Amino acid sequence: MPRTVVSTASTAWNGDLISGSGSTTLETSQLGTMDLSWKARSEDAEQGTTSPEELIGAAHSACYSMQFSNMLAENDTPPTSMNTSAKVSFNAGEGGITGIALTVTAQVPGIEDADFQRLAEEAKQSCPVSKALAGVEITLEASLG
């Protein structure tokens, strides 16, 4: 029986939304603390400052890569390499997160493009982070490289 694993991150925020700032800490992995600001969300990204949307993109690209690589391996065509990006679109008005564009390029010896495309789409649908983001349109561009 699979066990439930809990991962924890925490955020400290000071001030109001527009002029305030904060930091998010990756508690479980203890990999670090990242600065946050409204400007990083609603305007041009500030160097050294992240946003919830960038963190969602990181989670989604990592989860998708793991899911897709597992599905390829189960197909007896494990990837030798894979690069995935997730571009999260955010409308600072009432739209919120309006879409996520996944792009993956992989080296997969012995696979036909049709099978690669089918498994890429199945991985998008079955990735746990994709499921958590089901209310957002997620597009996929997959290519053998």
Task: List the model feature ranges, each with a label.
Residues 1-58, 65-145:
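Extended beta-strand/beta-hairpin segments
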